Amino acid sequence: MKRLIHFITYSKAAAYIAALLCVVSWCVQVEEKTLSGALWLLLTLLAGYLLVKVNREFSLSDSKSTLPATLYLMGSSIVPNLFAQHGAGMHVALFSYSCYVLLRTYRERCAMGSYFLAFTLIGIQCLLAPPLSLVLPWLLLCGAFMESLHVRTFFAALWGLLFPYWVVCGMLFLTDRIGIVAPYLRQISSMISNSLPPLSEFSWWGQFLWTLLIVVPGIIGILLNLAMNLQTSAIFRLLIGAVGVFFVAMWFSTAYAALLSCALLIAPLIGSAMFAMGGNRVKDIYLIVLLLVWLFLLVLSCGTACGFFN
């Protein structure tokens, strides 16, 4: 059992196996295998690599641990069509890199370029999925916690956020298609909802359950760990706040896939705070239980896609 725990937590092979299972699950469950769907899958795998880089650079749990990427790819393999059909892989890639850029601005005096880049990526996301604009206050709070947000970086962020809109409107104006802006604005109101998906949508609830099972013990581990430095503590508080923002936003938006995919990306970083600690028997048992739950959800989703449980 200890060897299995160590393999899942520290071995790069575990992350590679999870990535391979994610690809196999995508081939089994996604009916229409288009080029765009393969691109979203590739972006999802790249986001898993970025999690390893973030964990090592900021030492959130253990710099040698590949557990965040493994947990994320395991969650992505449960229902990959959620990413392929709704383009959530692109949102994951854009959001992960924008957060990575902001986290690197810790106590930087001249971070205008980083803020412009990060908020340009978020602006592209908001252009494609307007409900993601709910995360903008959290990003500004992230800059405040990193002690790099001031007047110049704020206006750099504002310019970066509006830049994609100006580019798109300029292209539409030059091609005499500016009239499609009004229907786009009317579609934004249709994305506002006050209800979650029905229980029959396993693709959403399976991912939600997996995210919740990772986040809750991670928060407990963070509360019990009193030896964190100021930067690590600030990052963990921001990550917990981000997951909370995404969970609340799901109640008021129909863009479930984009919001849940971003929450699923952050959850392993929080969960690694508990799972990467050694000498904790409860943690080891919970990780085994989590592995069994993942195996059950994976078999259920693949079996449903193949028609075994219909």
PLM features: residue spans?
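N-terminal membrane topogenic signal
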Residues: 1-19, 61, 281-285
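Juxtamembrane membrane-water interface segments that cap and precede transmembrane helices
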Residues: 22-28, 182-205, 215-220
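Transmembrane-helix motifs of polytopic, lipid-linked glycan transferases
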Residues: 42-58
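Membrane-embedded helix bundles of polyisoprenyl
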Residues: 65-80, 92-97, 118
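Membrane-interface transmembrane helices that cradle and orient dolichyl/undecaprenyl
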Residues: 98-113
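Membrane-interface alpha helices of multi-pass inner-membrane proteins
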Residues: 114-128, 246-250
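Perimembrane helix-loop-helix junctions
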Residues: 135-159
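Membrane-water interface signatures at transmembrane helix termini and the short loops
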Residues: 219-278
